Amino acid sequence: MMSDERYMWRAIDLARRAELQAVCPNPRVGAVLVWQDRVIGEGYHRKCGEGHAEVNCLDSVAPEDEPKIPDSTLYVTLEPCSHQGRTPSCARMLISRGIRRVVVGCLDPNPLVSGRGISLLCQSGIEVSAGCLEEECRQVARVFLTNQEQGRPYIILKWAESADHFLDRLRQSPEERPVAFSTPHTRMLVHRLRSRCSGIVVGRRTLELDRPSLTNRYWPLSPYSPKRFLLSSQEVDLEPGWELLRSVSPESMSYLLMENVTSLLVEGGAETLRAFLEADLWDEIYVEQVPDVTLGEGVKAPSLDALTPDRELVRDGHHLYRYRRWA
């Protein structure tokens, strides 16, 4: 139904407002309550441990509209939870409020839910429609779904390169400065990306040559900075605030998820990036290419010839490519 899709798009837009690091390990979820083709309530999950989207949606209903709730339709991007966690079961809350119809975007693969939320609603006599804009709803919850379905963080690779596909000149010491590719604007975009990830990893050579802070200081709108990891199979005397990641493997990624790293940003260097590509452990790749800079030789960037970007932007004369496995 076209009207169902219209209201589900609104729920998706609400879900996108959520700060990823505020809700993790929970998903981003949005909800809209509609009575006779009029929106009477909206909400989204804002922070882990606080009200879910369905609760916030119904709490937003004006007092004069509360009698309309039993005759309304709720649109929610993810299946309502059926279990008692930090917050009460949303499915049972909807049953208690007498909601007539619920339209669900996608199912929740969490073993504690996984169809149970919809079953509870149906058993109580609520009409349930599932799969409305399913792929779009899965997209907005992609970090959570990757955690649940693949048992690892959502992994993003990022690098900047010259027009002839080099990451940097060959350097031997920190005194030799790296080639500066990023503009103030693209640097801000990188720091915004950092703020959305709960972990960030670099290789040993990057740490030794660049001593990166890996904060999101150029994106002050978010208070979240990722947990820092060094990829090294050898013992390293790390400064406080760093942790060691010994390998790139499904097992090591599962370990990160158990350490509450729900999304991981891989910033380099070349060997570290290739390790994730060769292990086929990635979900998104961002490449900043500077068309007016050629190096001729140096540290070669990973090859993505077999992949096709799903988005290309131009900012300050730089080409920004995104490769994404999720639709």
What are these model-predicted stretches?
Residues 1-20, 26, 61-68, 153-327:
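Enzymes that bind and transform nitrogen-containing heteroaromatic metabolites
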Residues 9, 33-137, 275-277:
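Zn2+-dependent cytidine deaminase-like catalytic core
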Residues 23-24, 28, 49-52:
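A structural motif shared across PLP-dependent enzymes of the aminotransferase-like
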Residues 31-32, 159:
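A residue-level detector for well-ordered beta-strand positions
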Residues 87, 114-117, 141-143, 167-172, ...:
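Short acidic, glycine/serine/threonine-rich loops at helix termini
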Residues 119-122, 146-148, 218-220, 302-304:
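Short, hinge-like loop/turn segments at secondary-structure boundaries
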Residues 141-152:
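Flexible, polar/acidic helix-loop-strand segments at domain edges
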